[in-house]
Amino acid sequence: MPELPEVETLRRDLLIHLPGERVVGVEVLRSDSVGYPADPAIFIEQMQGQIFSDRMLRRGKYLLLYFARGAALGVHLRMSGRLLWRCGEAPLEPHTRVRIPMASGHELRFEDMRVFGRLWLIPVGVPPERVMGGLTRLGPEPFAEMFDGPYLAGRFAGRNQPVKSALLDQQLVAGVGNIYADEALFSSGIHPALPVGGLDAAALERLHRAVVKVLEAGIAQRGATLRNYTDAQGINGNYAGTAWVYGRKGQPCRVCNTPIERIRLAGRSTHFCPTCQRAQQSVQ
């Protein structure tokens, strides 16, 4: 699933291409790719003539692309979605679900192999949270001032949940997924199975700094491509090639040469270095 760095990369790409583009036609090839309005015909009708503004926001893994008249196109890529900026004459990708042609001859295409992603058209004056319910359940942005060691201490107090599982909770912090959770735990030297309630203030401060650091690195590398993710031009991200632990089972740790191990925590594949991330306390 695309995480914060991948969605932020996409936002920055679209900010280059979309402002001033006028929608001249919409084709919905898969009706369940449109979350709102429920009737794709209404979605198509209300998209006609919309002009994209330069107001393009990211909240966690969600995108909000605003139009000049105040409506917005909401996007969540989920597992395998892609937003692609294409010349209108370019062949359709195999899993294209929605086409949004522009007056310039270009198209914004929503491609989604697994069909979990969604587009929403948010009417003028309607809070996005009323249409995109997931926005109401998001915690702070990782780059927000309130996201720090003491914030983590308050949220983790008395809890026995593995720290890896806690980091994936979007109500704790918005935008962190499997890749960058593993990377942050390696960077902070914390074993992924340790109970969050047992982490001291120093460990939580390291973890806070590590989350910010690996997300910034992911953005700088234009995201991580493991299966489906590409940027708006269809180009793969570069982070996976420089990852510390994620996707590197059996390969030597880049710090100590110990083979990277993979376990499952709460049903999620989890990578770590058993030397750099020792289980320093018992895990029940």
From Swiss-Prot:
The keyword Plastid does not apply. Pfam families: Fapy_DNA_glyco (PF01149), H2TH (PF06831), zf-FPG_IleRS (PF06827). Binds 1 zinc ion per subunit. It catalyses: Hydrolysis of DNA containing ring-opened 7-methylguanine residues, releasing 2,6-diamino-4-hydroxy-5-(N-methyl)formamidopyrimidine; 2'-deoxyribonucleotide-(2'-deoxyribose 5'-phosphate)-2'-deoxyribonucleotide-DNA = a 3'-end 2'-deoxyribonucleotide-(2,3-dehydro-2,3-deoxyribose 5'-phosphate)-DNA + a 5'-end 5'-phospho-2'-deoxyribonucleoside-DNA + H(+). It comes from the Bacteria. GO terms for biological process: base-excision repair. The keyword Signal does not apply. SUPFAM superfamilies: Glucocorticoid receptor-like (DNA-binding domain) (SSF57716), N-terminal domain of MutM-like DNA repair proteins (SSF81624), S13-like H2TH domain (SSF46946). Keywords: DNA damage, DNA repair, DNA-binding, Glycosidase, Hydrolase, Lyase, Metal-binding, Multifunctional enzyme, Zinc, Zinc-finger. SMART domains: Fapy_DNA_glyco (SM00898), H2TH (SM01232). PANTHER family: FORMAMIDOPYRIMIDINE-DNA GLYCOSYLASE. This is Formamidopyrimidine-DNA glycosylase. It comes from Gloeobacter violaceus (strain ATCC 29082 / PCC 7421). The gene is mutM.
